[in-house]
């Protein structure tokens, strides 16, 4: 990855935010590559979606090298643990649907309010278990999120091929889950 970054970064017209998602890319940024990326002013941070707290802790261990370099986490189920460990925040799918929940969780973790973190994290887990587990495939996360956003009137649930939106039985289950969650998550 270092050779790739050495070649790519000088050609970019905009700053680069690294995205570590080995489940999809089949590669992961090595620690030395991340440390060297911190020295490159055009690389401005990293989002980690590896689902590994061990990997994230190793990345966070590099922050003394460049404390202003943002490290974000992708899986919302890890947001509170990541922020408590020193991450700067997250880019979480469920925040598109319930933004206040994720902001409150971030703020509670940042403040070290562990009782509030536990309470809010349990709600995030209900979102995850309820919306992202409908269907059989790994696409269930995006289908669940887009379907819930569509049912909430925020966007259409159409997806790029080969993915397809949920059919009526899955949409009905999604509606049921939304009806259960929404009163818990909205003021």
What are these regions (language model features)?
Residues 7-14, 22-128:
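Catalytic alpha/beta core domains of metabolic enzymes, predominantly
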